[in-house]
Amino acid sequence: MSKAKQTIHEFDLNVIYDYFSSVERQGPGSQEITLKALSFIDGLTEKSKVADIGCGTGGQTMVLAQNIPCEIIGVELWSDFINQFNQNAQNKNLHDRMKGIVGNMENLPFQEEELDLIWSEGAIYNIGFKRGLNEWRRFLKQGGYIAVTENTWFTEERPAEIQEFWQKAYSEIDTIPNKVSQMQKAGYLPIATFVVHESCWTNYYSIMQKTHASFLKKYKGNKTAEEFVSYQRYEAELYYKYKAYYGYVFYIGKKI
């Protein structure tokens, strides 16, 4: 892997978004994992309002809409993702109570205590776990829920190679007890915490691997695109090598 760029955020956003636009989910996850997390959420009705922050093209949002009767708003920075999101909702006949809007998770377009549930799979790291929990809390009604996935250490100690990679890629990565403590300090009652199964990661990396050839052909001679694919391959290699030490964890909390 090229050492020129050490984190995903150092690459051209247009290249990143184009890379992820061809897949249903832009990060590790599955219908089963989404439904497992949803099973811990109580009291949602037709009058409830849900926001999926960093929704991407809406793979997990469609699952939510098919299983709860609420109004759902997907928020995503990239307009092409939102176009796909809304087309997917139309195709699944869900557009009457869900829509995607272009927005920034640092400046969400909601009123205080407007939402009953905030959802975010594989996206809160863009603003940071602690910041996201603290800043988004005001949009939740009292007793409202937040459900997010976060890259997390499974052990107190880990090999230097993976420690160095993730400290550079996402310095807020931490252990489960520390993440739960951060949730409590942000004003939530921790409801559930569970590890996202490794099959979500292996399926995700397998799907992405299949897109590399066509992506590189599209960007033939583009050094940035080539470096980005190399970065993604390196990240996958590290996961297969060190998956015992880290992965996604679902954190579900209730505003108190």
Which stretches of residues belong to each language-model region?
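A short SAM/SAH-binding and catalytic strip from SAM-dependent methyltransferases
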Residues: 117-130
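Conserved Class I S-adenosyl-L-methionine
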Residues: 194-256
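Short, glycine-/aromatic-enriched active-site segment of Class I SAM-dependent methyltransferases
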Residues: 151-170
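A short glycine-rich, Lys/Arg-flanked "PGG" loop and its adjoining helix->strand segment in the class I
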Residues: 131-145
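Class I SAM-dependent methyltransferase SAM/SAH-binding core
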Residues: 51-53, 57-107
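Conserved alpha-helix/loop element of class I SAM-dependent methyltransferases that forms part
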Residues: 27-46
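A short acidic, Gly/Pro-enriched loop at the edge of an enzyme's catalytic core
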Residues: 106-117
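Short alpha-helix
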Residues: 172-187
